[in-house]
Amino acid sequence: KLGIVGLPNVGKSTLFNSLTKAGAESANYPFCTIDPNVGVVTVPDERLNVLGEMYHTKKIVPAAIEFVDIAGLVKGASKGEGLGNQFLANIREVDAIVHVVRCFEDSNIVHVDGSIDPIRDIETINLELIFSDIEMLERRIAKAVKVARNDKAVAKELELLERIKAYLEENKMARSFTVNDEDEQVLLESYNLLTYKPVIFAANVTEDDLANDGADNEGVQAVKEYAEKEDCEVFVVCAQIEQEIAELDDDEKKMFLEDLGLEESGLEKLIKASYSLLGLISYLTAGEPEVRAWTIKKGTKAPQAAGKIHSDFERGFIRAEIVSYDDLMECGTYTAAKEKGLVRLEGKEYVVQDGDCLLYTSPS
């Protein structure tokens, strides 16, 4: 699940509407998004259409991820300003963040701080996330102090908590914090810190800045430099244009993008990047009834991947017949791939790769 965050009036809800076509109320005033709007978004994957043609399939089922449009944040959110407490509670529930940053001038759309400054806006939100995390760490530290004297494990955790807190107090994000060992890593992940969640920046621009990916937009360049230091990705989008594209059918959309000099929409890139940011990949199953992308975490072994289809497949797993999508395309048919020795039998320890086409064998 990804949370779309940003200051009020930066284009969050417009972007969310484009992603989900959900029609979330998008108004030119702060806090028009009070309850988070949730939408399930399909992940673009051209491989499914190709397999669909190969197998003359009746149904194509793409992978999907969930996006949540979270209320606009303001300074002082960690102290309850605006919808701060609600915002922070909502964002704690997501796995990763799409941070929408305003990089366009428009006198008709008010900015809460009265001027356009993308880095200031990013840092405003980061500070509120930091303050919220520090507050949470302080509560944990207060509890740990009471028992640390008589419990070595708690004493060790207390030392970690204090190190993380000191790190955040330097206005740094927990995702760049360095742990000393695997135990500390497990603890760090268990705290569900807002500043530990992975982030993608969506630089929202005007139509004029789209064709050259915001190369002439100083705000976009500043965001890219900032993101590089934070080891985050940046995608240039025009939320208004994306909303228009979302209303078109496939042929119209293709023509529209060609007119803009684009191969794919900014949102398609953003969705794919978001899927990857969550550490997700797709393996594929194909046949006449359906072609489907199954979502798994990177590093998932074959039995657990099989369990995504049905729990019986995981319990009774023996082996899987696997061919990579690229090998299948090169050979033209599954039979030809098998004749060339490109279809492999893999056992319980096999780690499934993105684009693997699988056929499972289990006890009869």
Locate predicted features.
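Conserved nucleotide-binding/hydrolysis micro-motifs of P-loop NTPases
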Residues: 21-22, 47-48, 72-74, 102-108, ...
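Extended, highly charged alpha-helical segments
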Residues: 119, 124-163
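Structural motif
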Residues: 354-356
